[in-house]
């Protein structure tokens, strides 16, 4: 995909200009089967795209075989805050076994996207966020949100 050959839609450009004017980007999503909401995944693919969000610098630009190998260079969102908040539909113990892997959405976002764009990552996670949540659990979650917001 080359944005100079096939420019993104105006809506994507509008999101990008709003992000350029902001201090932080806050992404919130539910997590199903270790995947974020499809709409958010698609938004990330469109908006946080090279060369606006990051670009690559080749280690060996003149090499026929290794010219594509290099490292990311942060773009428009460099040194801003990227906040991810996800709700998991079950108790923490059911996701604990997967938490060591890089396949869970938060780690995938942090390592492959946010770090490429130079964002400082913050994370807010919830477990057992269901429609029939007890008031005590809801208040505990809201305390986490308040503490998190004050830390920014």
Spans of features found by a protein language model:
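Extended, charge-rich low-complexity interaction segments
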Residues: 4-14, 145-152
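Helix-loop-strand module that forms the ligand-binding subsite of alpha/beta enzymes
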Residues: 6-107
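Glycine-rich phosphate/pyrophosphate-binding loop and the adjoining helix
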Residues: 93-152
